Amino acid sequence: MAGELKVLNALDSAKTQWYHFTAIVIAGMGFFTDAYDLFSISLVTKLLGRIYYFNPASKSPGSLPPNVSAAVNGVAFCGTLAGQLFFGWLGDKMGRKKVYGMTLMLMVICCLASGLSFGSSAKGVMATLCFFRFWLGFGIGGDYPLSATIMSEYANKRTRGAFIAAVFAMQGFGNLTGGIVAIIVSAAFKSRFDAPAYRDDRTGSTVPQADYAWRIVLMFGAIPALLTYYWRMKMPETARYTALVAKNAKQAAADMTQVLNVEIVEEQEKADEVARREQFGLFSRQFLRRHGRHLLGTTVCWFVLDIAFYSSNLFQKDIYTAVQWLPKADTMSALEEMFKISRAQTLVALCGTIPGYWFTVFFIDIIGRFVIQLGGFFFMTAFMLGLAVPYHHWTTPGNHIGFVVMYAFTFFFANFGPNSTTFIVPAEIFPARLRSTCHGISAAAGKAGAIVGSFGFLYAAQSTDASKTDAGYPPGIGVRNSLFFLAGCNVIGFFFTFLVPESKGKSLEELSGENEDDDDVPEAPATADHRTAPAPPA
């Protein structure tokens, strides 16, 4: 049985070794790039509006029209959703390693192409930018199921949660780096090409050279991805895929002996036995009986979490303006506005985002996934209500810092909570031959939530007073009521967490049921399953 395969037992009981940390860095740099690319757009959207939608007759600086802003902010999420489903499925069909390099090269190419977006009109530039950001998102989407699955299948069961969490925690550094790069670029351009505030000189407040600033910020994301490509190609296929899906226990033992200091004996007959028993398909009656409620729990929790998380993260600049933590747009030049938005996001990343990720790394294998996720949803709800109920108090002079502190705590408990655990758990609780697919489905549900948040929040957060809305937007429900809605999403996630099993300290095969006999599964020749081609020797 799978639980008795020596190659898998050796992986579960292996001491933490140098290659584990190497794998964390290789997989983590993908997530560093993912976070940088997905969140860097929020740093430059105000600048894009000033450059391409400038109206000299307007008292306010140019801003992206509602449909354009929604597309620029949300199109990468649409690509990510599609990529999660496609590459998740492909990772179970072709193997984790074969697909892993494809996603990274797609990210590198589209990162560079995003910064080279062109057109004879504003619409042309935005259309080109959206095209490349969709395919950038497609590559990013593949990184979610593949990185999580690869790390879970390499790790030992004692520290598996920390290893997967460490990969995901690189997102925090991606966010931070995005802010730092934007600060450096905007400061450098501002010092070289200084400009007056918009209200003092509407045309001169946006210097022509500012068109290079946003391009540099977007293109920088290609560098860490490119540096990681070689090492991804050197990684061997995971032993769990090779033994349980490709049915080659000998190759699995050989691969793991090369990279981990463990003695492994091949057991082809036991691997064949697992293949004969574990043949039920995705969404079959047996799958739904074993894992249906688990998949429902992971998808719903990730969906509602990302509505709250991404709507808040993408639109930090709007929230900061609403509480007057950022000056009014017409009192700043274009590059000064970019600098101050980037500085604010960097501060939140440094104080709220990164600590939350690493608290998860340190505590997840001590207190478990369930407690962290449940507690995270609870405290996110509490802090969002703490922002929403006395919202008018936070907008009065002298109370803005308190708002930012409370806002940072919501990010802390998102990352020391469901933002991390919703990524980790789907990589642990499903069978090896469906693991990448199920993680992709769960992650795609999350990105559907991100799309709802990124598109919906643009409209919902608009003032209820039509005279105070951004140009082109109808009146919304306001930031205060939007925060109430996001708190409600967290409440839903709290209750659906009870559908997700605790995976701390258990082997992947114990969690997925692959080490259990099941009378409902008919005996069949090992060659009857043609759904996955055996992986060739590395």
From Swiss-Prot:
GO cellular component term of the entry, any: membrane
Protein role: High-affinity transporter for external inorganic phosphate.
Keyword Transport listed: yes
Protein family per UniProt: Belongs to the major facilitator superfamily. Phosphate:H(+) symporter (TC 2.A.1.9) family.
PROSITE patterns: MFS (PS50850)
Biological process per Gene Ontology, one example term: phosphate ion transport
Ranges facing Cytoplasmic side: 1-23, 91-98, 145-163, 232-294, 368-369, 418-440, 503-538
Disordered: annotated span: 507-538
InterPro entries cross-referenced by the UniProt entry: MFS_dom, MFS_sugar_transport-like, MFS_trans_sf, Phos_permease
Regions crossing the membrane: 24-44, 70-90, 99-119, 124-144, 164-184, 211-231, 295-315, 347-367, 370-390, 397-417, 441-461, 482-502
KW Zinc (keyword) present: no
PANTHER family referenced in this protein's UniProt entry, alphabetically: SOLUTE CARRIER FAMILY 22 MEMBER (PTHR24064)
Species whose genome carries this gene: Oryza sativa subsp. japonica (Rice)
A Gene Ontology molecular function term of the record: phosphate transmembrane transporter activity
Protein name stated in the entry: Probable inorganic phosphate transporter 1-4
Gene that encodes the chain: PHT1-4
Protein's cellular compartments: Membrane
Other comment: Although related to the sugar transporter family, it does not transport sugars.
